[in-house]
Each structure stands twice: as C-alpha cells, then as structure tokens.
C-alpha cells in the first residue's frame, strides 16, 4: 500500500496491471479513502485563514472562478487531467461544485476578497491591479491548502512502515519549504490587496480571444526552463536562501470570449527572458505553449467533454500530463538539470493539439 500512496502524488506511475487491480480492489479503495479522510481532517483548521475568526464550516472556494467552470461544463460536469493520466486513485470527472475546491477561509471573506475578479462583468477591459492581487491571493491559498493536506497525508503514512517514514520525511521536508514560500506569497498578495497597490505584480501577457476555449485554468506555476532551455527555477538548489519563483496563469472562459492573463511578482527577474521570448511568438504559438505548460506543470485544469477524444488520443498530451518535477539522476554521469531541460522542453508544444486555438472553440 505504501507504493500506492506514493503514486497518488506521482502522476502516471501505475502499470496497466496495477490500474486494473486498484479499480477492482474495493478493500484497498476503502483503506485509501479512510487515509485521505484522516489527512483532510488533520489538515482542517478551526479559524479562517484570512480573517482569523473561529469558524465551524468553511467556504467551498474554487481555484478557478465558478462561472468559468459553468461556461465549459456539460450537464454540470467537467473533465480533469486524469483523462490523460489515468490514475485510478484520482477522479476523471468532477461536478462544478467540486472542481478545484479548497476549504481554508470563511464564506464572508470569500464573498468579499474575490468579488472583483470573480465578477464576469469586470472583464470588458484588462484586469485591474486589484483583480490581479485577488488572483494571486487565491492561487496562494489553494497552494497552501494543498501543502497542508500533503504534509498531514505523509505524516500519517510515515507511521505505516520504515520505508514510508523515510520517503515521507524527505517529501515533507520539501513540502515545508514550499509551504513557507506559499505563505510569503500569500502575505504579499494580501498586503497588495489591502493597500490597493499597482506595483506588486507585473502583467507580462494579456489576451482576449473572441471565442470560448474548452479549458478553465488558474494556477501559479514554477517553470523550470524557458524557450531556449535556460533554467528558470533550479529545483535541485539546496540553499535555504534560494527562492523558487512562480508565474501566475489564468485562462478564463466567459460567455462568448476568453481572457488570458499571465503575471509575476514584481522583482522576479528570472522570468524576464521567458516572457520576452513568449511575447515574440505568434498568437497560435503562444496558445500552444500555454496548452503544453498547463499539462506539463499542473493538475488543476478543467476542460470540456467536447475535447475528450482529442485529449485521450494525443500521446504527446498524455506524456506531458505525466511529467513531474521529482526528477532524480541516480548516477553521477547524468546531469539532473539536463534531464530537466529535456523533460520540460517547450519545443514539445509543436507535438500536441493546440486546445486553446479556435479549432477547438466551444462558441
């Protein structure tokens, strides 16, 4: 069971035989369900993360604005990355009410602090600095929630076997570092929102498409390489002084249009070459790059059933969806950064269906 707990966080790690066993082994499913429930309960707070007030229930917050999910849903359902990953421990389909949700703040705070960017009427023009700060705040909260859960999950699994303890200790050492950085980003976003600052974030790309794309996405990502293969984030740097830098990407399908926003924290200079290279691409090439980046770096994308066949039948998309950053070189003869460059090469955008292009539009 320990290997399966590890594979829950290692997309695409199961063999076909293991997948079939996990789909039919109801005893195992019950054990895993209990473990996940225990981890969620252990990670649950008794105060709102934003205002600090005691609460008995939390808001069902969405990482992607609910109205965007509704715009691409079929009978209230959207597909997840598991459509290509095929991990038997993950859902392939989610109802809009459960897609990308987290429970960290109270209903009152959720309704107030995200009110600007979660209003579809506010996208007639480029998002305001306040809306950008709200996006950054939401991304930070989602990341914090995810890491709090994973820390408890691995704390619990560490009690199972010695092997589980060794793996869990190593995983949680990284999780704790991630959590600290997410909390720092959260504090920055909260401060920017409270003072209505226009200088804390730099919007490096904004586009409004005159059609509805079949994908809804909002996340902060730590890109590894740029278009020329230069390292942006060295995930192997052991120094506690080295800070991973994230880029925020939002792909928001409206009723008849789509808004795309990409921004960074002001001062995050490692992305400078990346966004300069990106902005020189044609529109189609930009959309292909964004499609690849979503599949390669995040699990938190949701898409319409209208493109299910295209997604399932693309071997390149499936491989991109299974790409992880836990890449380790087990021999001194191989440079892990070279492996990272190859596995995360943005040249692969030419091999995948460009799901953000007009060809796949919903309307």
What are these regions (language model features)?
Residues 180-363:
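Charge-dense, low-complexity intrinsically disordered regions
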Residues 1, 24, 129, 133-136, ...:
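Non-membrane alpha-helical secondary structure
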Residues 77-179:
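Internal, well-ordered alpha/beta segment that forms a basic, Gly-enriched binding/recognition surface
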Residues 5, 17-18, 22, 26-36, ...:
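Generic structural signal of hydrophobic/aromatic residues within well-ordered alpha-helices
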Residues 48-51, 137-140, 144, 217-219, ...:
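Generic structural hydrophobic/aromatic packing signal, biased to beta-strands
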Residues 65, 106, 125-132, 307-312, ...:
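General structural signal for secondary-structure boundaries
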Residues 2, 9, 14, 26, ...:
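Phenylalanine-focused residue identity feature
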Residues 2-119, 124:
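An N-terminal structural lobe/cap that precedes and organizes the functional/catalytic core
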């Amino acid at each position: 069971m320990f290997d399966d707990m590890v594979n829950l966080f290692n997309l695409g790690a199961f063999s076909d035989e293991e997948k079939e066993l996990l789909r039919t082994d109801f005893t195992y499913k019950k054990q895993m369900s209990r473990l996940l429930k225990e981890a969620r309960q252990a990670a649950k707070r008794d105060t709102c993360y934003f205002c600090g007030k005691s609460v008995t229930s939390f808001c069902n917050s969405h990482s992607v604005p609910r109205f965007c999910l509704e715009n691409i849903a079929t009978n209230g359902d959207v597909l997840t990355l598991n459509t290509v990953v095929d991990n038997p421990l993950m859902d392939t389909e989610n109802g809009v009410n459960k897609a990308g949700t987290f429970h960290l703040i109270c209903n009152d705070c959720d309704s107030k602090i995200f009110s600007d960017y979660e209003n579809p009427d506010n996208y007639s023009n480029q998002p305001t600095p306040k809306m950008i700060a709200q996006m950054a705040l939401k991304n930070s909260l989602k990341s914090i929630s995810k890491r709090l859960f994973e820390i408890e999950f691995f704390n619990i699994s560490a009690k199972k076997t010695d092997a589980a303890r060794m793996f869990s200790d190593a995983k949680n050492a990284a999780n704790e570092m991630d959590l600290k950085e997410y909390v720092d980003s959260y504090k920055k976003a909260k401060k920017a929102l409270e003072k209505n600052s226009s200088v804390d974030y730099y919007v490096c790309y904004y586009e409004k498409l005159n059609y509805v794309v079949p994908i809804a996405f909002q996340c902060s990502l730590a890109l590894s390489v740029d278009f020329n293969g230069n390292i942006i984030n060295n995930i192997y740097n052991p120094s506690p002084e080295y800070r991973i830098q994230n880029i925020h990407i939002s792909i928001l399908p409206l009723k008849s249009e789509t808004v795309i926003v990409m921004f960074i924290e002001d001062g995050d200079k490692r992305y400078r070459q990346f966004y300069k290279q990106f902005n020189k691409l044609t529109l189609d090439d930009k959309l292909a790059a964004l499609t690849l980046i979503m599949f390669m770096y995040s699990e938190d994308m949701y898409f319409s059933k209208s493109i299910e066949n295209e997604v399932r039948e693309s071997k390149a998309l499936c491989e991109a969806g299974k790409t992880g950053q836990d890449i380790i070189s087990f021999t001194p003869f191989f440079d892990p950064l070279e492996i990272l460059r190859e596995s995360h090469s943005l040249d692969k955008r030419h091999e995948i269906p460009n799901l953000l292009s007009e060809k796949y539009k919903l309307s």
